[in-house]
Every structure is written in C-alpha cells, then in structure tokens.
Amino acid sequence: MVYCENQFGLPDGKTAAALVRHSELYSIVGIIDSSLAGKDAGEELGEEKSGIPIFADLNDALESLSYTPDCYIYGKAPLETFIPIKERLLILEAMMKGMDIISGL
C-alpha cells in the first residue's frame, strides 16, 4: 500500500508513480490519495489501466481488500524536510495494524 495524499501523479508523488509503473520488490495493491479515490492508478498516470485502485484512506483500503498488506510505503517527497505530524499519525496507524513502514526519506 502506497501513501501519496494529494500528490499522486504530481512531481512530489514520483516515488508512488514509479512503484505503480514498475516494482520488482513490492506488489503494489493500492494507493492512498483521497483526491483521486475510486480511480485506477495507471489511468491517472496517463497509462493503461493497472488494476491498482486509489483509496481515500487506509481504512477504506482495508475494507476493500480481503487482507492487510505487508507494507505501508510513504510515497511522497514533501517540500518540508520532515514528515508532518498528521502523516506521522497515519504511519503509526499502519504500524498498529501490523504493517511494515517503508520510506525513502
């Protein structure tokens, strides 16, 4: 699961976009970006339908999937030099649900 709130398909969401396009290490099962919820990640990148859904939030994703993904990937490159408090709380929520956290920051 890749978190990319309000940035998927934009320059600050390049990590998430790259993972949707190609990943040998991770199986991407969804993107979290409430501004694009209900859409297909591949189509939002101007490509073919990928079958990777975009969810409003983690709870929406977990309700739609029949399992909890192994990883929660922070797929944004924020302008700030730190992860904002609100997003840190979302990371903690994913940890409490048993997900490993992956971040390139």
Where does each model-flagged region fall?
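N-terminal phosphate-binding or glycine-rich loops at protein starts, especially the Walker A/P-loop
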Residues: 1-25
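Short glycine-rich anion-binding loops that position phosphate/pyrophosphate groups of nucleotides
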Residues: 7-8, 37, 76-79
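Generic hydrophobic/aromatic pocket-lining and core-packing "Φ" positions
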Residues: 16, 87-91
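N-terminal beta-loop-helix "entrance" segment that forms/cooperates
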Residues: 26, 34-53
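Short internal beta-strands
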Residues: 27-35, 102-105
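Glycine-rich, highly charged phosphate/nucleotide-binding loops
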Residues: 46-65, 83-87
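N-terminal glycine-rich "phosphate-gripper" loop used for MgATP/nucleotide binding
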Residues: 70-88, 105
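Beta-strand-loop-alpha-helix segment that lines the small-molecule cofactor/substrate pocket
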Residues: 90-105
